Regions:
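Transmembrane alpha-helices
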Residues: 20-21, 30-33, 163-167, 173-175, ...
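Transmembrane alpha-helix signature in integral membrane proteins
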Residues: 71-104
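Membrane-helix interface segments
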Residues: 74, 106-115, 143-147, 188, ...
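Interhelical loop and adjacent transmembrane-helix boundary motif
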Residues: 6-15, 44, 60-74, 216-248
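N-terminal signal-anchor/first transmembrane alpha helix
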Residues: 1-39
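A structural signal for multi-pass alpha-helical bundles of membrane permease subunits
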Residues: 31-46, 81, 130-141, 154, ...
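Membrane-interfacial helix termini and adjacent extracytoplasmic/periplasmic loops
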Residues: 4-8, 50-58, 63, 111-112, ...
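Cytoplasmic-entry segments and transmembrane alpha-helices of multi-pass inner-membrane transporters
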Residues: 14-22, 96-133, 178, 202
Length: 248
């Protein structure tokens, strides 16, 4: 955006300083991705830039790792698991998180702040501690090493995001609308689905996106709670880097 002709020297300094700062932040966020992408075209089975790649020699580049991704059963199964587990975890997170947010928005609920702090604690507690706790709890109830165990574990991580986004949407909600619906004979469920849900839908969708991304990217909890049969894509990526140092 161009500066107006009447901008003072101080305003010009601030403007260009601001643009420089934004550029540095953008570079800091994008540079790791820019570095990783060329490595996926490495012709060698090493997670490093070869002399041929640095010299831009075509012999140093290959699509072999992409072929491996789509043909190797380990990668295809991990991708399938992620595409199954993440939507299911998102559905559970959205259902429970939305109900919790709507319930906590009621004025007559006691200890709302305490309950809210407990519900969003998975965002605060270190992930390794949450994962260890889930491992012992799910082992005791027979869910460790099962698909539903991983789904519920990821749902626990996603619920706080749904609660926060839906609660933020409910701040501007007009309570007189629910009272008007009730006065016209609508029950609580009908009032929720016909009046309240359409108005808070942006918050629900935002929370669902956060919950899906959290589940799809998560690796620590699934290592504790899951087994080889529930190996997700991030887990397979972690294994490939740790054991094989593979660019795939």
């Amino acid at each position: 955006m161009a500066l107006p002709s009447y901008a003072s020297p101080a305003q010009k300094i601030w403007h260009y300083s601001y643009l420089t700062m934004c550029g540095l932040i953008f570079f800091f966020l994008i540079f790791p991705i820019v570095v990783i992408i060329p490595l996926s075209f490495n012709a060698q089975d090493f997670f490093t830039f070869t002399p041929e790649m640095l010299a831009l020699d075509p012999a140093g580049f290959s699509l072999k790792h992409y072929v491996d991704f789509f043909t190797n059963p380990d990668w295809t199964q991990a991708t399938y698991n992620s595409l199954v587990i993440a939507p299911m975890a998102t559905l559970v997170s959205v259902s429970l998180g939305t109900l919790a947010a709507v319930g906590l928005s009621q004025s007559h609920v006691p200890f709302k702040r305490v309950i809210m702090a407990i519900l969003i604690s998975p965002m605060i507690v270190p992930l390794i501690i949450s994962a260890a706790g889930m491992y012992f709890f799910f082992s005791a109830i027979g869910l460790q090493g099962t698909y539903w165990g991983v789904v519920l574990a990821h749902a626990i991580l996603g619920i706080p995001f749904v609660i926060i986004t839906v609660t933020a949407t409910l701040v501007g909600f007009d309570r007189s609308l629910t009272r008007a619906a009730a006065s016209m004979g609508a029950g609580p469920l009908r009032t929720f689905f016909k009046v309240q849900l359409p108005l808070i839908l942006p918050g629900v969708i935002s929370g669902a996106l956060f919950a899906f991304i959290t589940s799809f990217d998560e690796v620590v909890v699934v290592i504790f709670v899951g087994s080889a049969g529930q190996q997700t894509l991030p887990w397979q990526m972690f294994t490939g880097l740790r054991e094989q140092i593979s660019p795939t």
